[in-house]
Amino acid sequence: MYTYMEYLQKCFYKSTNWNEDNIYSNITATSQALLDFPIPNGFKIDSSSKTTDYSASSFTLSNHHQINGSLAYLYSSIPLTNTMGTKDVSLQDAIAGFRIIEPSVGLSSKLTNNIIQNRSSLLYGRMYFPGSALEAMIIKRITKNSQLLIKCVNNPHLEKNGTMIVYLQNNTAKYSRELIYSTNEALIGLRCLYNLGNDATSHNFPHVNPAVIPKFDNSVISIGTELWYAARTMSPGLSAALRYSTRSTSTGKPLTMTLAINPIVGHISSTYTVKTSVASTFCSKYDFNVFSYASNLSLGFELYSYANKKKNTFPSFEHHEIYSSSEENKYLKKHPELQRHHRVPIKSHKYQGNRTIINPIQNLDNVYHINPTLLSSTTNSPTNNDNSNTSETVTAAFQNLVNESDFSSVFKFSTSLNDKVVKILWEGRLKDFLVSTGVKLSLNPITNTPEFNKLGISFSYAL
């Protein structure tokens, strides 16, 4: 679960149209959210308030080993009007989970002029007690595609009482580049990420027979690398990663595959993540070292539950002009009286007068039945007669259904076969609070008995 300050930072990025998924450090963010999610340790309570559209404050208190806490402040040069408190915020925005990667869309001229004129910036600071530890962050937009990010930590337990990291980032639709400097070990880094893919697959085939249009659209291949050099110790660093994201036009379900390589230490990591339904996601990760031949398999999933479990409010595509999903069909078979007004036909998508089939499927059920008549180029097709409304693609409807779903909680589970670790996490809404509780279990290598590594609960409240 994001802290309130992290949530405001993401809202700031959305307001300024900054694509976080286009940054190299986030290339494996989806698998990390499903496999490496943090477990609360002890008791923690977080109370936050956005006093104005430009500023917010947060107070945190916990009892991990001892009573400690922190006080944080945040200021934004642009109004953060797209934020919500814990009572109204959707769990999709408050909890790290599956990220649907799609081609970036350029800024509108109105928003671009506004951003360039204001030179948007964000200031953040946090003070910890007891003790004298401080942390700060500055985000300064230089142009519409570049920004300066500075992170500082002051702690008497660190070497030279602290460290500072400076990021100079350039983020466009096709690529992103980062130049990084850290005072720790005089570390210098360079990160690059390039996107290979089409912004709109269907628009690139206006003169091609619709029958041969690929069954996947919005596919994006991202290739990135990072280079590091520690000047003080003269130590190099290198890694490369690849991410493939796509969404099936038959079901609308997205999937993401990644491959990360560190040639210096010989480590290879591959992940496969798929959103199996609107409320569930599955992820697998395989690690292998070419030098030691050590390997590890990690599995994880997340399962959302709906806030209202009444049968008449079962989530459906009835407001989206596509056919029902398999889960809805199971429900409709038990209630035949609802089938009459439930389904609506798939309408063809028109592009410059040439009909392009987005999803040539009719009678979508647990078994898909392809309708060859939809693949015909005949202009007298029944699907062309009704042009009163513009239907959306299955991929867009699935994404909209995920965004519009009212979830009350999410259950996360992950395990690692080689490490013999099990993590269980529950996050949800309790009255006006967001609650996160979980446990981390591991197998004692000597006694072969399970033992608790972490166990805790945290409450978050924000106005």
Swiss-Prot record:
Pfam families: MDM10. GO terms for cellular component: ERMES complex; SAM complex. The keyword Mitochondrion applies. GO terms for biological process: establishment of mitochondrion localization; mitochondrial genome maintenance; mitochondrial outer membrane translocase complex assembly; mitochondrion-endoplasmic reticulum membrane tethering; phospholipid transport; protein insertion into mitochondrial outer membrane. Keywords: Membrane, Mitochondrion, Mitochondrion outer membrane, Transmembrane, Transmembrane beta strand. It is found in: Mitochondrion outer membrane. It comes from the Eukaryota. InterPro entries: Mdm10. It is a multi-pass membrane protein. Component of the ERMES/MDM complex, which serves as a molecular tether to connect the endoplasmic reticulum and mitochondria. Components of this complex are involved in the control of mitochondrial shape and protein biogenesis and may function in phospholipid exchange. MDM10 is involved in the late assembly steps of the general translocase of the mitochondrial outer membrane (TOM complex). Functions in the TOM40-specific route of the assembly of outer membrane beta-barrel proteins, including the association of TOM40 with the receptor TOM22 and small TOM proteins. Belongs to the MDM10 family. HAMAP family: Mdm10. Lacks alpha-helical transmembrane segments, suggesting that it resides in the membrane via beta-sheet conformations similar to those predicted for other outer membrane proteins and porin. Component of the ER-mitochondria encounter structure (ERMES) or MDM complex, composed of MMM1, MDM10, MDM12 and MDM34. Associates with the mitochondrial outer membrane sorting assembly machinery SAM(core) complex. This is Mitochondrial distribution and morphology protein 10. The lineage of its organism: Eukaryota, Fungi, Dikarya, Ascomycota, Saccharomycotina.
